[in-house]
Amino acid sequence: MEVILLERVAKLGQMGELVRVKDGFARNFLLPRGKALRATAANRDKYEHMKADLEARNIEAKAEAAKVAEKIDGKNVIVIRQASETGQLFGSVSVRDIVTSFEADGVKITRSQILLDAPIKTIGRHTIEVAVHPEVEVGVSVTVARSVEEAERINRGEDISSRREDQDAAAEAIAAAGEFFDPDAQQDEEPEQQ
């Protein structure tokens, strides 16, 4: 089916372009959401009359999106999750979790605006894209950690795994010095027998 795009659609085209799409995509997504019109002669004339109004609305929406983009550009949100010692999460961080973190910071973003290829499954700092408008995308970082303190260390650039190795080395040094429990050692007092 041929349609006329009423706004920019990712991986499809710009506003006003005549594109050929599968019938189901047009009927179930583009037409009901007002993103396109069927490419009939009457609709082509209708689009030409609406073109100036659509462009004005697009400019207004883009300006509002630019304000939101300025507010969140480079922003860092923290998501706390349980994880193993190796940094693998017990579960994952999805788009819904990221939206919830933004809402906690007072920023209104929808799930469809976050461009995340696959759920996040490891501890660390991850960069994702947020499309606040079809023509405006910004990068934000998501810090996934087991605690707020660990998130702060990750944001400072500390390597969490090397810190664990340092703790293990300190424990081995204490053990080598002989400051550990000896099960064969004599006790000072013997318990009373009954």
Swiss-Prot record:
This is Large ribosomal subunit protein bL9. Pfam families: Ribosomal_L9_C (PF03948), Ribosomal_L9_N (PF01281). Residues 181-194 have a biased composition (Acidic residues). GO terms for cellular component: ribonucleoprotein complex; ribosome. It comes from Rhodopseudomonas palustris (strain BisB5). The gene is rplI. Belongs to the bacterial ribosomal protein bL9 family. Residues 156-167 have a biased composition (Basic and acidic residues). Residues 156-194 are annotated as: Disordered. NCBIfam families: L9. GO terms for molecular function: rRNA binding; structural constituent of ribosome. Binds to the 23S rRNA. Keywords: Ribonucleoprotein, Ribosomal protein, RNA-binding, rRNA-binding. HAMAP family: Ribosomal_bL9. One of its GO terms (biological process) is translation. The lineage of its organism: Bacteria, Pseudomonadati, Pseudomonadota, Alphaproteobacteria, Hyphomicrobiales.
